[in-house]
């Protein structure tokens, strides 16, 4: 099959590999992007991408919290110019506020009333599209709550209060001091913004992802020519390292890399004054996995794709 310049560009962004390697990988896997990433990894050309996804859309992430709940919303625009518009920012903030009184998903939020209006969120966004003159998409929304404790929040690349390019929620269940729990929770939220973990615990990691890593590690280990029993131990070691990289509680804590997040939680219990648990987290990066219309791709890539 014919490999396009856009496919080569996408694989380069996902894998960090060179143009010709990406072209060879796509040709050998009939254009299957996921298989091409695995092909490059087996060759030792690309590293694991914990959450493959192109960040291309404009817009904003909004965060609002109240009592023991907090929400994240993402609303996309066509240009960054509109994302800096006061009306657009008000809409993102108000949609997040509306989400607090719903189940938190896009469907329930869209059908709810827009704050201070008799119109729904969906209708208000449609009206705003006409006013602003640019398409807007209410892409996703999520809500996190605790029975007793705090939901800490963090906005990265902040453009206004509660608005930015990346947002994180962290649920900390505890009967202890809520202010101390919130301080620690915010540190964990900043950690998550930086490390982008796949799951809270090893058990939460998708079994398909684990099997995929195991298959790749096995292929890499067999290239060493070592006996099967040694290969098995090599794979176990690499899987252990994989979990340390993608599981939140097992990751080295960004604020103190000498300890894990789980150990940092135990330390934080001293200031919290009671046992504490991280029960969940949500991370939204603007445009994650969204493909923006291509304008004009570099001529060198087009030439490489043509061969």
Curated annotation (Swiss-Prot):
Q: Cite the residue spans of the region called Involved in Mg(2+) ion dislocation from EF-Tu.
A: 79-82
Enumerate the CDD domains for this protein.
Answer: UBA_EF-Ts
One GO molecular-function entry: translation elongation factor activity
| Keyword field | Cytoplasm, Elongation factor, Protein biosynthesis
Known Pfam families for this protein? EF_TS
Per its record, how is this protein called by name? Elongation factor Ts
Q: Which SUPFAM superfamilies match?
A: Elongation factor Ts (EF-Ts), dimerisation domain, UBA-like
Q: Which GO terms describe its cellular component?
A: cytoplasm
The main location class comes to cytoplasm
UniProt similarity note? Belongs to the EF-Ts family.
User: Where found, per UniProt?
Assistant: Cytoplasm
**Protein species of origin:** Bartonella quintana (strain Toulouse) (Rochalimaea quintana)
Signal peptide: which range, if any? none
Q: What is this protein's function?
A: Associates with the EF-Tu.GDP complex and induces the exchange of GDP to GTP. It remains bound to the aminoacyl-tRNA.EF-Tu.GTP complex up to the GTP hydrolysis stage on the ribosome.
Q: Which InterPro entries match?
A: EF-Ts_dimer_sf (IPR036402), Transl_elong_EFTs/EF1B (IPR001816), Transl_elong_EFTs/EF1B_dimer (IPR014039), Transl_elong_Ts_CS (IPR018101), UBA-like_sf (IPR009060)
